[in-house]
């Protein structure tokens, strides 16, 4: 009987374990393939293929980007730069956002299938601080989801897992991801759109540009707007409003 109960549990964990295994293998095998140097070396072949087969290139790019994010492979930043390099700020940013959102959704579904429902039930049944945290997230889901997407310091993989573990509805996850990653995607896509000049000078792009004041401050402003409802709810709760 115990053996029978273990099998469904292992089957439920199979998707997230498979992603973890592919991520580990990818980190070893693709470390040099999905890199800025590889993009620089193959840029002429990529642009020539794009010019000859634009639709195929766009579809293949989005499929590859979705796989990179969905399997947590190294190279998501390089993929974003590549989107800008090949397709410009627009539709490059659109391709990047859509592919990243689809990849994030794959991780979300795998994690929720394996762990989310069970962990969420345990948190609902618990008491004390754990229950308060779960209740706080449930009451402010939209704000929290946008916040973890907007804050540059939150790793993308973490922002995909946490909502799954607290049983956030799929549509909320998808919408908040698609909208929340837009600022960062536009910034890095614009960097990618300027790679032609960077390649010509033999330089490397400034990937720390998102932390420069003229870009970081507006993003922090969006973070403040995202967390404002949480603060207002907390104040109202204390005052009994």
Task: Describe the role of every protein-language-model region.
Residues 80-81, 108, 117, 160-161, ...:
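Transmembrane alpha-helix boundary and packing residues in multipass membrane permease domains
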Residues 15-26, 167-186:
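Hydrophobic alpha-helical membrane-insertion segments
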Residues 63, 67, 94, 98-102, ...:
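Hydrophobic residues within alpha-helical transmembrane segments
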Residues 181, 185-198, 203:
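Non-cytoplasmic
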Residues 10-21, 213-224:
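Hydrophobic H-region at the start of alpha-helical membrane spans
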Residues 2-6, 13, 24-62, 101-158, ...:
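Membrane-interfacial helix-loop-helix
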Residues 100-104, 114, 181-189:
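Transmembrane alpha-helices and adjacent helix-loop boundaries
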Residues 65-94, 153-161, 171, 181-187:
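Transmembrane helix boundary and interhelical junction motifs in multipass membrane proteins
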